[in-house]
Amino acid sequence: MAIEKYFIPDFVELQRRSFQRFLETGLIEELNKRNPITNSQKDLEILLYPEYYKLAPPRWNSLDAILLSKTYSCRLYVPAQLTNRKTKQIMFKWVQLGDIPLMSKRGHFVVNGAARVIINQIVRGPGLYFSEIQYNVDSSKKTLVRRYAAEFISMRGTWLRLSIDKEKMIWAELKKTPKIPLVWFLLGMGLTEKILFQSLTQPKRLLYNYLDYLKIDNLAIDVKSQNDAFAKRALLRELLLKSKLNSSNIKTLKNSKDFKPLLLVNDIYSEMHSYKEKENRRYPLNSQNGDLADEKEKIPYYANSSLKALELIYSKITNTKKITNLNKKFFAKQGQKWIFKKFMNPRTYDLGLHGRLSLNKKLSLSLPLSQRTLTMYDVLVATEHLLRVEQGLLGTDDIDNLKNRRVRTSSDLIQMQIGIGLLRLEKNIRSKFTTIKGVPKINYFFSTKPLNGALKEFFGTNPLSQFMDMINPLAEMTHKRRLTTLGPGGVSRDTATMDIRGIHPTHYGRICPVETPEGKNAGLVNALTTFARVNPEGLIETPFYKVYKGQVQKKAGFFYLSAEKEEKAIIAAGDLNLSKTGFLPKGLIPVRKFDEFTKVLRNYVDFMSVSPLQMISVATSLVPFLEHDDANRALMGANMQRQAVPLVRSEQAIVGTGIETRIASDSGHVIRAKAGGLVGYVSGQKIRIYTFVSNF
């Protein structure tokens, strides 16, 4: 233990590294999303150059900001170019967009003189997830039917859900919008019928939505032609079928078991004819009124083209039942706008880089990573996967598995808020485009209020921005390493189930199973473990030693594994006695493979844990003899240490675990030298250190 404490990573690294990532890439990425800004006539254009942005030195340091009740921030300047195509003029100038709050060395922000910490939020990662839905068939609620759903989750924009209901109909669902038949949605996104029905192994399933309208008991598609539909029974109650026969040959076909008519559906699925089983003559069905349908009349419930699908989608979401010839074009255009705005506009819908990576991997697609919006092929292939999940050929996703969850660090949350501020700035600029007179200057269009207002809202009112817990150094440390599932875009403490609150096998080495609050927030607010880190994708990783033929390769360093990479690995415990040459003990060794504990020979081991402290958090690792504690008492002990009043004069713990020094050092409450060396002089004003390192 005495040696291992020096390999423990910096405890505040998560906060500092995430903010560094925001300054290096996140800010530039967010500014590029609003580039360029043009007016409606396209003759005025403002272009920003985010790669060359500059931050002016802050007016106060973090300590002075606290004393003066100011914000520790710096001014953000970006070069901007205004192009006037009417006068063929180009103006260039540096403009101030706003003030960016800076993070201190200790990993917190100073806003209006108060130290604030941004909590790390753990949410479902962007991508595609398959889940199971259970429906009650009867009123007794004893008979359950299992159905499945596919859900597209985006970083920004509307979530889309493809669900199969208990009648086996497939629907496209959005929040606050009536559900739409999947055929309409796919055709509305631009797919043709030929591609649609040839790409799916079960094209008949897309027609199940129309059985209710046609009142057919069962419908099946002939695989060879994909154009012939068979009905087991002859009764088609409210459907009007047309006939090109003479009136003398017309007979009324009634519901009878003797007749099994063939319903011929042509390529646009709009004309149907009925046949008698043993005769070649055509028998059109009468409607309930006894009238035959007009030859030009078509079944209004099936869309035979993208244009028709767009009309139906818009009429569905606006609850407009009747579509006349006058407003057909308007409806189609509005439906097209609606689909584009919801899923195909990069300004309103964004899967993110990791969302596109996840989608390509799950659906075996090769779309470019720059394609951050949803495409028709994403939805089409997801439909095919959903049908395979229903057949049992593919499995559903475990949403509690950490491979399906992402951590939103402070950089991600600030970047999202800056995106909101830049959107407001863009709207301001567009409104000023309409009111300008004469030759405008660049400064006329820009204001610091939109960006500053958005950041002020975030730091002041967002539940993830909290006053720093300053009871003692440990309280500060754990506050900066906290993970929560609450907050905007997360779960609600009132509706959270035990599955969300429980401990998952993938939590090992990533989320502490002990440290969590008591009460309503139990299991929803957690702590990062001692050795864990968050990679740029937002996945929590934990280190292991590689084991090669039974020998632990300590000199090779740590191998950080995410939950997905660890799934198939066989991992040995970190407290095994090794030989002098680094070999694991002979005989059977207790190991873990995902959620199973078993024993194997050392040659089968892939990795070894780096320390017994790996599975617990910083606060829990301060509890002496933790292995002898009851779990509930250990939880209370870990929490109550944060409430301890600090000593006026620091003392070493009588009973300690060995990492107290690191916690005090990383908290920033002690004086730290830039490099190690020999102390040569100490006074009330300075400490002089002689070091062997020349440049530091």
UniProtKB/Swiss-Prot annotation:
<dbReference type="Pfam" id="PF04561">
    <property type="entry name" value="RNA_pol_Rpb2_2"/>
</dbReference>
<dbReference type="InterPro" id="IPR037034">
    <property type="entry name" value="RNA_pol_Rpb2_2_sf"/>
</dbReference>
<dbReference type="GO" id="GO:0003677">
    <property type="term" value="F:DNA binding"/>
</dbReference>
<dbReference type="GO" id="GO:0003899">
    <property type="term" value="F:DNA-directed RNA polymerase activity"/>
</dbReference>
<keyword id="KW-0808">Transferase</keyword>
<dbReference type="GO" id="GO:0006351">
    <property type="term" value="P:DNA-templated transcription"/>
</dbReference>
<keyword id="KW-0548">Nucleotidyltransferase</keyword>
<dbReference type="InterPro" id="IPR015712">
    <property type="entry name" value="DNA-dir_RNA_pol_su2"/>
</dbReference>
<dbReference type="GO" id="GO:0009507">
    <property type="term" value="C:chloroplast"/>
</dbReference>
<dbReference type="GO" id="GO:0005739">
    <property type="term" value="C:mitochondrion"/>
</dbReference>
<dbReference type="Pfam" id="PF10385">
    <property type="entry name" value="RNA_pol_Rpb2_45"/>
</dbReference>
<dbReference type="InterPro" id="IPR042107">
    <property type="entry name" value="DNA-dir_RNA_pol_bsu_ext_1_sf"/>
</dbReference>
<dbReference type="InterPro" id="IPR007642">
    <property type="entry name" value="RNA_pol_Rpb2_2"/>
</dbReference>
<dbReference type="GO" id="GO:0000428">
    <property type="term" value="C:DNA-directed RNA polymerase complex"/>
</dbReference>
<dbReference type="Pfam" id="PF04565">
    <property type="entry name" value="RNA_pol_Rpb2_3"/>
</dbReference>
<keyword id="KW-0150">Chloroplast</keyword>
<protein>
    <recommendedName>
        <fullName>DNA-directed RNA polymerase subunit beta N-terminal section</fullName>
        <ecNumber>2.7.7.6</ecNumber>
    </recommendedName>
</protein>
<keyword id="KW-0934">Plastid</keyword>
<keyword id="KW-0804">Transcription</keyword>
<dbReference type="GO" id="GO:0032549">
    <property type="term" value="F:ribonucleoside binding"/>
</dbReference>
<comment type="similarity">
    <text>Belongs to the RNA polymerase beta chain family.</text>
</comment>
<dbReference type="InterPro" id="IPR019462">
    <property type="entry name" value="DNA-dir_RNA_pol_bsu_external_1"/>
</dbReference>
<comment type="function">
    <text>DNA-dependent RNA polymerase catalyzes the transcription of DNA into RNA using the four ribonucleoside triphosphates as substrates.</text>
</comment>
<dbReference type="InterPro" id="IPR007645">
    <property type="entry name" value="RNA_pol_Rpb2_3"/>
</dbReference>
<keyword id="KW-0240">DNA-directed RNA polymerase</keyword>
<comment type="subunit">
    <text>In plastids the minimal PEP RNA polymerase catalytic core is composed of four subunits: alpha, beta, beta', and beta''. When a (nuclear-encoded) sigma factor is associated with the core the holoenzyme is formed, which can initiate transcription.</text>
</comment>
